[in-house]
Amino acid sequence: MRPVLKAGLRAVWRDRDTLQIGVDPRRAVALSGMGDAGRVISLLDGSRDWAEVVAAAKDAGISVKTVQRVLGLLAGAGALSDLPLATLNALTPVTRGRIGTELATASLTYGDSDGGARTLARRRLAFVRVHGAGRIGAGVAGLLAAAGVGQVVCRDGGLAGPQDLSPAGLGLADLDLPRADGVVRVISRIAPDVQTADRGERPDLAVLTEPGQPEQAAELTRAGIAHLAVAGAEGVAVVGPLVRPGRSACLRCLDLARSERDPAWPLILAQLAGAGDGARDGSCDTVLAATVAAQAAVQVLAFLDTGRPGRAVSDGA
């Protein structure tokens, strides 16, 4: 093991003898009686294994017993990572820099001691298909690619219009060109190593960003493919549910439940399904679309990382 303080955790002194690891109250740990032993922290940069850390500390005048105590406290507090060198060496310098923050966040979120290596491996093997390349769909695809998902494919048969342009997705250069091709360009600018070709394989998850497409959801349910519904209209956006066929309610179930409360819902739903391309991202402004895309990406990544739907996040979560 080559111990390193988990990326993102900051070491600060509360007083001369108490070292605090992390600032967020949910993760912060205070280690008392540290004194000069705090110098051991500077040796935990991932370049040394346990024995080399002990040797370097000894050269600095720190006893073996003290080093072992510090390492034991940090390990017990879940503040150490051991990211395999092979994982880093397999990445290009640019990818390593881009993925580094993803690994740090994953390691903190899931409590892994491998520096996020397991999470990275799962994401790189994952395949997500995004249906719809409007402001929301293009944003979701770009975020997933940037977060390390190995294959992101976008299905959309339309051409890009001014209403599709967004800092989080398609740009001026994509106007009047196929939206799906525009998403490929978005991904290639961020993560050129991500696969974008649609060869018809079965995805690990599908994201539905176009409203009023019940037959699409039904097809995914029949195929047993997990899918996340995302909608934005009339200034309101909804992320979810994330449907796991055979394990959770499907979108059809929700429509039936709504029909019990509102007998006119089937008629309304049929009209929404026939609204055509003009209903895409209707009244979902740029900021809302970007927010929805980010929240959808959070849900997708949680599912890929753990096999379970994520939870809504907020500043106080």
Describe the residue ranges of each PLM region.
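Adenine nucleotide-associated cytosolic modules
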Residues: 1-317
